[in-house]
Amino acid sequence: MKKTKTMVASISTLIRRTYPSTNQCNSLATIQSQTQLPRESLQHHSSAEGRLRFSGRVFCSESGAGCWNCGEKAAFLFCNSCRSIQPVDDSVDYFQIFGLEKKYEIDPGSLEGKYKDWQKKLHPDLVHNKSKKERDYAAEQSAKVTEACRTLTKRLSRAMYIMKLNGVNVNEEETITDPTLLMEIMELREAISEADDSTSLNQIRSQVQEKLKQWSDSFVEAFESQKFDDAVKCIQRMTYYERACEEILKKL
Protein backbone atom coordinates (compact mmCIF):
# COMPACT_ATOMS: atom_id res chain seq x y z
CA MET A 1 0.00 0.00 0.00
CA LYS A 2 2.84 2.36 0.81
CA LYS A 3 4.29 1.85 -2.65
CA THR A 4 0.91 2.52 -4.26
CA LYS A 5 0.55 5.82 -2.41
CA THR A 6 4.02 6.78 -3.58
CA MET A 7 3.08 6.11 -7.20
CA VAL A 8 -0.17 8.07 -6.89
CA ALA A 9 1.82 10.99 -5.54
CA SER A 10 4.12 10.67 -8.54
CA ILE A 11 1.18 11.01 -10.91
CA SER A 12 -0.06 14.02 -8.96
CA THR A 13 3.31 15.60 -9.57
CA LEU A 14 2.99 14.88 -13.29
CA ILE A 15 -0.42 16.52 -13.41
CA ARG A 16 0.89 19.64 -11.70
CA ARG A 17 3.69 20.09 -14.21
CA THR A 18 3.44 23.15 -16.38
CA TYR A 19 1.03 22.23 -19.15
CA PRO A 20 1.93 23.45 -22.65
CA SER A 21 -0.48 25.78 -24.39
CA THR A 22 -1.52 25.04 -27.95
CA ASN A 23 1.21 27.33 -29.19
CA GLN A 24 3.65 25.01 -27.44
CA CYS A 25 2.12 21.78 -28.72
CA ASN A 26 4.66 21.58 -31.49
CA SER A 27 7.68 22.20 -29.27
CA LEU A 28 7.84 20.59 -25.84
CA ALA A 29 10.99 22.17 -24.45
CA THR A 30 13.92 21.31 -26.71
CA ILE A 31 12.54 18.23 -28.48
CA GLN A 32 10.52 19.81 -31.25
CA SER A 33 12.18 17.80 -33.99
CA GLN A 34 11.35 14.52 -32.26
CA THR A 35 7.65 15.21 -31.96
CA GLN A 36 7.07 16.54 -35.47
CA LEU A 37 4.59 14.30 -37.27
CA PRO A 38 5.19 13.36 -40.90
CA ARG A 39 2.93 14.90 -43.49
CA GLU A 40 2.07 11.42 -44.73
CA SER A 41 -0.13 10.92 -41.65
CA LEU A 42 -2.54 13.57 -42.90
CA GLN A 43 -4.89 12.55 -45.69
CA HIS A 44 -7.25 15.08 -47.17
CA HIS A 45 -10.68 14.42 -48.53
CA SER A 46 -13.92 16.29 -49.12
CA SER A 47 -17.17 15.74 -47.20
CA ALA A 48 -20.74 16.30 -48.32
CA GLU A 49 -23.16 18.29 -46.24
CA GLY A 50 -26.94 18.21 -46.09
CA ARG A 51 -29.30 20.98 -45.05
CA LEU A 52 -30.71 20.97 -41.54
CA ARG A 53 -34.43 21.25 -41.08
CA PHE A 54 -36.21 21.51 -37.75
CA SER A 55 -39.87 20.94 -36.89
CA GLY A 56 -40.65 20.95 -33.20
CA ARG A 57 -38.51 18.24 -31.63
CA VAL A 58 -37.94 16.56 -34.98
CA PHE A 59 -34.41 17.07 -36.22
CA CYS A 60 -33.46 15.73 -39.60
CA SER A 61 -31.30 16.46 -42.58
CA GLU A 62 -32.25 16.62 -46.22
CA SER A 63 -29.86 15.53 -48.93
CA GLY A 64 -30.01 15.53 -52.68
CA ALA A 65 -31.29 11.95 -52.76
CA GLY A 66 -34.95 11.31 -53.49
CA CYS A 67 -37.25 8.86 -51.73
CA TRP A 68 -36.78 5.32 -53.05
CA ASN A 69 -40.57 4.82 -52.99
CA CYS A 70 -42.13 8.02 -54.36
CA GLY A 71 -39.18 10.04 -55.66
CA GLU A 72 -39.83 13.09 -53.47
CA LYS A 73 -36.94 14.75 -51.64
CA ALA A 74 -36.46 12.60 -48.55
CA ALA A 75 -35.40 13.46 -45.01
CA PHE A 76 -32.87 11.47 -42.98
CA LEU A 77 -35.34 8.93 -41.60
CA PHE A 78 -38.81 9.18 -43.14
CA CYS A 79 -40.04 10.53 -46.45
CA ASN A 80 -42.26 13.50 -45.64
CA SER A 81 -44.54 12.60 -48.54
CA CYS A 82 -45.19 8.85 -48.31
CA ARG A 83 -43.65 8.23 -44.85
CA SER A 84 -41.47 5.41 -46.15
CA ILE A 85 -38.38 4.64 -44.06
CA GLN A 86 -35.27 5.73 -45.95
CA PRO A 87 -31.91 3.97 -46.33
CA VAL A 88 -28.85 5.38 -44.60
CA ASP A 89 -27.60 8.52 -46.33
CA ASP A 90 -23.83 8.72 -45.92
CA SER A 91 -23.84 12.40 -46.91
CA VAL A 92 -25.49 13.19 -43.56
CA ASP A 93 -22.79 13.64 -40.92
CA TYR A 94 -23.11 12.80 -37.23
CA PHE A 95 -23.68 16.38 -36.15
CA GLN A 96 -26.53 16.78 -38.62
CA ILE A 97 -28.21 13.61 -37.38
CA PHE A 98 -28.68 15.24 -33.97
CA GLY A 99 -29.23 18.77 -35.23
CA LEU A 100 -26.01 19.96 -33.58
CA GLU A 101 -23.76 22.77 -34.68
CA LYS A 102 -20.67 21.35 -36.33
CA LYS A 103 -18.13 22.22 -33.65
CA TYR A 104 -16.03 20.32 -31.12
CA GLU A 105 -17.69 21.61 -27.96
CA ILE A 106 -21.20 20.17 -27.66
CA ASP A 107 -23.94 19.94 -25.02
CA PRO A 108 -23.88 16.32 -23.75
CA GLY A 109 -27.43 16.63 -22.41
CA SER A 110 -28.76 17.76 -25.78
CA LEU A 111 -26.95 14.92 -27.55
CA GLU A 112 -28.34 12.32 -25.16
CA GLY A 113 -31.88 13.65 -25.43
CA LYS A 114 -31.87 13.67 -29.22
CA TYR A 115 -30.31 10.22 -29.32
CA LYS A 116 -33.15 8.84 -27.19
CA ASP A 117 -35.70 10.53 -29.46
CA TRP A 118 -34.15 8.89 -32.52
CA GLN A 119 -34.12 5.48 -30.86
CA LYS A 120 -37.81 5.81 -30.02
CA LYS A 121 -38.60 6.56 -33.66
CA LEU A 122 -36.49 3.59 -34.79
CA HIS A 123 -37.72 1.10 -32.18
CA PRO A 124 -38.64 -2.28 -33.74
CA ASP A 125 -42.11 -2.14 -32.16
CA LEU A 126 -42.87 1.01 -34.17
CA VAL A 127 -41.76 -0.40 -37.52
CA HIS A 128 -42.89 -4.03 -37.20
CA ASN A 129 -45.80 -3.44 -39.60
CA LYS A 130 -43.49 -2.02 -42.28
CA SER A 131 -42.11 -4.03 -45.17
CA LYS A 132 -38.95 -6.10 -44.66
CA LYS A 133 -37.08 -3.59 -46.78
CA GLU A 134 -38.08 -0.74 -44.47
CA ARG A 135 -37.40 -2.78 -41.32
CA ASP A 136 -33.91 -3.43 -42.63
CA TYR A 137 -33.48 0.28 -43.34
CA ALA A 138 -34.65 1.08 -39.79
CA ALA A 139 -32.08 -1.33 -38.33
CA GLU A 140 -29.33 0.28 -40.41
CA GLN A 141 -30.46 3.76 -39.39
CA SER A 142 -30.50 2.73 -35.72
CA ALA A 143 -26.96 1.37 -35.99
CA LYS A 144 -25.75 4.61 -37.57
CA VAL A 145 -27.46 6.75 -34.92
CA THR A 146 -25.88 4.64 -32.17
CA GLU A 147 -22.43 4.91 -33.75
CA ALA A 148 -22.90 8.65 -34.21
CA CYS A 149 -23.81 9.11 -30.55
CA ARG A 150 -20.89 6.96 -29.39
CA THR A 151 -18.48 8.93 -31.56
CA LEU A 152 -19.66 12.36 -30.44
CA THR A 153 -19.89 11.44 -26.74
CA LYS A 154 -16.16 10.91 -26.17
CA ARG A 155 -13.65 13.73 -26.49
CA LEU A 156 -11.10 11.69 -28.41
CA SER A 157 -13.40 10.15 -31.02
CA ARG A 158 -15.23 13.47 -31.45
CA ALA A 159 -11.92 15.24 -32.10
CA MET A 160 -10.91 12.66 -34.69
CA TYR A 161 -14.30 12.82 -36.38
CA ILE A 162 -14.46 16.59 -36.69
CA MET A 163 -10.92 16.57 -38.09
CA LYS A 164 -12.08 14.02 -40.67
CA LEU A 165 -14.96 16.30 -41.65
CA ASN A 166 -12.36 19.00 -42.24
CA GLY A 167 -10.32 16.79 -44.54
CA VAL A 168 -7.75 15.42 -42.11
CA ASN A 169 -7.59 11.72 -41.25
CA VAL A 170 -5.65 11.22 -38.02
CA ASN A 171 -3.53 8.16 -37.34
CA GLU A 172 -3.70 8.06 -33.56
CA GLU A 173 -1.32 5.07 -33.59
CA GLU A 174 1.52 7.22 -34.96
CA THR A 175 4.59 6.53 -32.81
CA ILE A 176 5.50 9.39 -30.50
CA THR A 177 9.18 9.79 -29.65
CA ASP A 178 8.75 12.63 -27.16
CA PRO A 179 10.78 11.32 -24.17
CA THR A 180 8.94 13.52 -21.67
CA LEU A 181 5.54 12.17 -22.70
CA LEU A 182 6.80 8.59 -22.86
CA MET A 183 8.18 8.88 -19.34
CA GLU A 184 4.84 10.20 -18.10
CA ILE A 185 2.99 7.32 -19.71
CA MET A 186 5.41 4.76 -18.27
CA GLU A 187 5.01 6.17 -14.76
CA LEU A 188 1.25 6.36 -15.20
CA ARG A 189 0.99 2.72 -16.23
CA GLU A 190 3.19 1.71 -13.32
CA ALA A 191 0.95 3.64 -10.93
CA ILE A 192 -2.14 1.92 -12.32
CA SER A 193 -0.46 -1.47 -12.03
CA GLU A 194 0.60 -0.83 -8.43
CA ALA A 195 -2.78 0.53 -7.28
CA ASP A 196 -4.49 -2.22 -5.29
CA ASP A 197 -7.72 -0.59 -4.15
CA SER A 198 -10.58 1.40 -5.68
CA THR A 199 -9.69 4.56 -3.77
CA SER A 200 -6.22 4.73 -5.32
CA LEU A 201 -7.54 3.85 -8.77
CA ASN A 202 -10.25 6.49 -8.64
CA GLN A 203 -7.71 9.06 -7.50
CA ILE A 204 -5.47 8.26 -10.47
CA ARG A 205 -8.48 8.20 -12.78
CA SER A 206 -9.49 11.70 -11.69
CA GLN A 207 -6.01 13.01 -12.39
CA VAL A 208 -5.85 11.31 -15.78
CA GLN A 209 -9.22 12.78 -16.74
CA GLU A 210 -7.89 16.21 -15.83
CA LYS A 211 -4.92 15.65 -18.11
CA LEU A 212 -7.25 14.46 -20.86
CA LYS A 213 -9.35 17.60 -20.52
CA GLN A 214 -6.27 19.81 -20.71
CA TRP A 215 -5.22 18.26 -24.02
CA SER A 216 -8.82 18.46 -25.18
CA ASP A 217 -8.84 22.19 -24.47
CA SER A 218 -5.58 22.58 -26.38
CA PHE A 219 -7.13 20.69 -29.28
CA VAL A 220 -10.02 23.18 -29.38
CA GLU A 221 -7.60 26.09 -29.56
CA ALA A 222 -5.54 24.45 -32.31
CA PHE A 223 -8.58 23.31 -34.29
CA GLU A 224 -10.32 26.68 -34.18
CA SER A 225 -7.08 28.32 -35.32
CA GLN A 226 -6.87 25.73 -38.12
CA LYS A 227 -3.46 24.63 -36.85
CA PHE A 228 -4.17 21.06 -37.84
CA ASP A 229 -0.64 19.74 -37.24
CA ASP A 230 -0.89 20.90 -33.62
CA ALA A 231 -4.41 19.48 -33.38
CA VAL A 232 -3.13 16.07 -34.53
CA LYS A 233 -0.47 16.07 -31.80
CA CYS A 234 -3.10 16.90 -29.20
CA ILE A 235 -5.24 13.98 -30.40
CA GLN A 236 -2.33 11.57 -30.18
CA ARG A 237 -1.68 12.61 -26.59
CA MET A 238 -5.39 12.33 -25.78
CA THR A 239 -5.18 8.75 -27.07
CA TYR A 240 -2.67 7.78 -24.40
CA TYR A 241 -4.75 9.18 -21.55
CA GLU A 242 -7.97 7.69 -22.94
CA ARG A 243 -6.33 4.27 -22.89
CA ALA A 244 -5.12 4.85 -19.35
CA CYS A 245 -8.72 5.54 -18.29
CA GLU A 246 -9.79 2.28 -19.94
CA GLU A 247 -7.08 0.37 -18.07
CA ILE A 248 -8.29 1.83 -14.78
CA LEU A 249 -11.92 0.94 -15.50
CA LYS A 250 -10.89 -2.67 -16.13
CA LYS A 251 -9.38 -2.84 -12.65
CA LEU A 252 -12.27 -1.17 -10.82
Swiss-Prot record:
GO terms for cellular component: cytosol; mitochondrion. It is found in: Mitochondrion; Cytoplasm, Cytosol. One of its GO terms (molecular function) is ATPase activator activity. It holds the Pfam family HSCB_C. GO terms for biological process: [2Fe-2S] cluster assembly; iron-sulfur cluster assembly; protein complex oligomerization. Residues 93-165 form the J domain. Residues 1-59 form a transit peptide. It comes from the Eukaryota. Disruption phenotype: Floral stems lacking the epicuticular wax layer, distorted leaf trichomes, and under-developed siliques with shrunked and non-viable seeds. Strong reduction of the activity of iron-sulfur proteins such as aconitase and succinate dehydrogenase. SUPFAM superfamilies: Chaperone J-domain (SSF46565), HSC20 (HSCB), C-terminal oligomerisation domain (SSF47144). Keywords: Chaperone, Cytoplasm, Mitochondrion, Transit peptide. Interacts with ISU1 and HSP70-9/HSCA1. Belongs to the HscB family. Co-chaperone required for the assembly of iron-sulfur [Fe-S] clusters in both mitochondria and cytosol. Required for the activity of iron-sulfur proteins such as aconitase and succinate dehydrogenase. Involved in iron homeostasis and may take part in the control of iron translocation from roots to shoots. This is Iron-sulfur cluster co-chaperone protein HscB homolog.
